Structures are given as C-alpha cells and as structure tokens.
C-alpha cells in the first residue's frame, strides 16, 4: 500500500470522534481500561498528530488513544483467528486451538498452545478490513507456567501479498518482549501503528511451551 493511501486512511480515521481510550503509556500497575478526556491537538501546533496535506506515517509516530479490538469480549470471532498446523489440533489439543488465544480467558483450554515449539509457528488475525492497530497485549497460559517470552510481528493488507515484518528504527525486524509469568499482561505499543488487514505473531522464545492469550489495540481518534 502506498504512503499516500496510508495517509488518506489515517486522515479518515482521525476525522472521527472517540470518547473512550486507553492510556498510551505502559501500564505501571493501574487499570489501563479507563476513560480519558480528549485533547484537541490533532491539527496545528508543535504536538500535532496530523497536519493538512500529511501523507506519511511519520506524521503520527504513535497513537494517543486505543481501544481493545475484541478478543476478550468475543467481538473477534473464531474464524478470524488461525494458527500454523491447524490440522494437528485433534484429541487433547482440540481444546487449545487458535480461537482460545483470548486475553483473560480462564479454565481448561484457556490459551492457544502451539503443537510444535519452533520459530516457524504463528498466530494470525484477519481483521476483515483494513484497520489501524496500535498495540498488542499478551498473557501466558492461565493454569500452568507456559508462555511466550518474545516475538516478532508480520502484516499484510491482502492475502495475495507477501508478509512484511514490523521493523525497528534501525531497519531490523523488531523483537517484542513478551511474558515472564502466566498471569501478568504485557503491553507493547506500535510506534508507528500498523495499517493492515492481516496480523501475525511469530513466537521467537518461550517458557516450556508456546502459549498465548492476547488482545490487539485499535487506534481511535481524539475528540473533535
């Protein structure tokens, strides 16, 4: 997708109003799911997030307000979440499919467990349409000490296109650090956000076994 199209999508996005957001800073122990007043600095001024005629992601290094996409709430449907080697999920593993990768899920089958433990495994989300994704939340398995310790992210706007790795400032594939226990939620914000339809998490490290509960954060505009 060209920079001009990306810019146009962001311009449309930030033209809408939003009244509910998540803090764009890392959670330091307080509940991140709270209402926050909007500031009207979307255009003009030294802290502007968007300026007239802007056509690149450089104009929006980070998203100020976020909302959960719907893994935990169920708005993200089972058919939107897929994984590597789906045909292997039979017997005991049939309770630990990709659809179980939902933040704060509890009980038996509370996470996605990869059948194989190597860096060729993946968890994929089809957003059904192009969205602006600004963050990723992860947890480990709820009942046993198994979790993902680090991962990379791929994305693409169309299933006919090749996957693109999310890069760091040096141009290398960015490594996101994940969990260190089974219960804590680790938040990684995307600066800049990803504008895409398909998102993949590629586990690069894990404790005992690849186990993921997750949520995606969608970027929403500031109030007009």
UniProtKB/Swiss-Prot annotation:
Gene3D superfamilies: Galactose-binding domain-like (2.60.120.260). Homooctamer of 4 homodimers; disulfide-linked. The homooctamer has a flat, cogwheel structure with a diameter of about 14 nm. Two stacked octamers can assemble to form a hexadecamer. Keywords: Cell adhesion, Cell membrane, Disease variant, Disulfide bond, Lipid-binding, Membrane, Secreted, Sensory transduction, Signal, Vision. PANTHER family: F5/8 TYPE C DOMAIN-CONTAINING PROTEIN, F5_8 TYPE C DOMAIN-CONTAINING PROTEIN. It holds the Pfam family F5_F8_type_C. This is Retinoschisin. The lineage of its organism: Eukaryota, Metazoa, Chordata, Craniata, Vertebrata. Changing residue 59 to S: In XLRS1; loss of octamerization; no effect on secretion. GO terms for molecular function: phosphatidylinositol-3,4-bisphosphate binding; phosphatidylserine binding; protein-containing complex binding. Restricted to the retina (at protein level). Detected in the inner segment of the photoreceptors, the inner nuclear layer, the inner plexiform layer and the ganglion cell layer (at protein level). At the macula, expressed in both the outer and inner nuclear layers and in the inner plexiform layer (at protein level). Detected in retina. Detected only within the photoreceptor cell layer, most prominently within the inner segments of the photoreceptors. Undetectable in the inner plexiform layers and the inner nuclear layer. One of its GO terms (biological process) is protein homooligomerization. Binds negatively charged membrane lipids, such as phosphatidylserine and phosphoinositides. May play a role in cell-cell adhesion processes in the retina, via homomeric interaction between octamers present on the surface of two neighboring cells. Required for normal structure and function of the retina. It comes from Homo sapiens. Changing residue 141 to H: In XLRS1; no effect on oligomerization; no effect on protein stability. The keyword Transmembrane helix does not apply. The gene is RS1. It is a peripheral membrane protein.
